[in-house]
Amino acid sequence: MPTTSSTATHDVVLIGGGIMSATLGVLLQKLEPTWSIALYENLDQAGLESSDPWNNAGTGHAALCELNYSPMDKNGRVDVTKALGINEQFWITRQFWSSLVVDGTLKDPKSFINPLPHMSFVWGDDHADYLRARYEAMSAQPVFAGMEHSEDPEQIRAWAPLLIEGRESGQRLAASRHTGGTDVDFGSLTRQLVTAMAGAGAEVRFGHKVTGLTRGTDGRWEVKVKNKAAGSEVVDRARFVFVGAGGGALPLLQKSGIPEIKGFGGFPVSGQFLRCTDESVVNQHMAKVYGQAAVGAPPMSVPHLDTRFVNGKRSLLFGPYAGFSTNFLKTGSYLDLPLSVRPHNLTTMLDVAKDNVDLTKYLVTEVLKSRDKKIDALHEFYPEADGGEWELITAGQRVQVMKRKGRFGGVLQFGTEVVTHADGSLGGLLGASPGASTAAPIMVKLLERCFPAKTAGWDGTLKELIPSLGHTLNDDPALLDEVRTVTDAALKLA
């Protein structure tokens, strides 16, 4: 058994080397450059779990094409409230990245973000009617101005020829398109942010697994960390801890013993994609094209055919195909889910199971799908696809939040959930999509909750980094145009 060989003391400890910890670390260095920061990551590099480009779809989620963010209500009206919120969040993230490029923290923006049209594509009368109504509702909003819509197959062919080639005529098709979308390599971005953190004085440790998180008698958090290569342990005593360990955040927050984590559970959903690198195919498609989710499918399982830019190379991705695994991390253990069950979240989890029979059936069906069935799903988007040109890859784990509702009930929540201790000394993030795209606003929100006495003093620096902070761009078209112009130039998107 390894023994504790040393102790360390830091103002801030970040657990996990993904996009959230990286974003928070850089933010804190801008706001409090004298604070000491340590980051511990279990794997050998930053951004290898959920942030890795092949473990997610790389969509800069701005609600331009994702139909689940703009549902139709019971009165037949498309509700764009959630879409507006997500779009505003991505503008905050874009401004943050732009400021980091301008000040030299990030180097070549092309290494992590590229302009790419975002499209929605459906077929059948009901779906086409919905997409028309969505287009009318969305295009009336300043942040979505410039959206195009067509039911003409030839126009859709001009936008994305693979969708039309070989498709039977007579089927009603509809597509909406916005040229302001992006593809993001969150793995590359994360690694650049962590490198910048280390260069600014943060202590970054890879191959270090956090095994314990308890409160010391003096109020500091004692973070027990195992050096996997050396077999030694260190206890890092920190004033503030952020648990940004992706799917691994729930077990660590449970170990902390904070009352705010009571009632929370995790529902892991695995995923696979089909990937094509054949240039003769890849060069015919330049868009992210999102469709409608199947009945009972979770939002992260909306099918989409995407252009990807990874390590300077273009490829296509189709999926995701959802599945179920009890791992909370791709590199985790099958015991992750059962070991997360506690008396305080058991009723939450049972109630969620009872109310989500359709989801369970859907996941079982997806798990049992053969490769041929997966190719059949691809053919619905790309009729002439040759299955031999596509390889099946396993994506990252998405641990959806199960949250207490009432005294004994529970609800399955899609999205992210910030959990903080009452005294602000500990914060963590649960959940998944849109996740990475909203890293900057989520981390700003976490800072406001954990350091309320500091926020007034930080306001000036935050507004230098994110000029629109505190404003709603959709209500201020002039500011929106200014932010778009500045960020397009800095990120080389124009």
UniProtKB/Swiss-Prot annotation:
Cofactor(s) needed by this chain: FAD
Catalytic reaction list: (S)-malate + a quinone = a quinol + oxaloacetate
Pfam families for the chain: Mqo
Gene name per UniProt: mqo
Organism lineage string: Bacteria, Bacillati, Actinomycetota, Actinomycetes, Micrococcales
EC code: 1.1.5.4
Gene Ontology molecular functions: 2-hydroxyglutarate dehydrogenase activity; L-malate dehydrogenase (quinone) activity
Keyword Oxidoreductase among record annotations: yes
Listed GO biological process terms: tricarboxylic acid cycle
Transmembrane segments: none
Keyword Flavoprotein: yes
Protein family membership: Belongs to the MQO family.
Record pathway: Carbohydrate metabolism; tricarboxylic acid cycle; oxaloacetate from (S)-malate (quinone route): step 1/1
InterPro entries the UniProt entry points to: FAD/NAD-bd_sf, MQO
Keywords: FAD, Flavoprotein, Oxidoreductase, Tricarboxylic acid cycle
HAMAP family (alphabetical): MQO
Protein's name in the database: Probable malate:quinone oxidoreductase
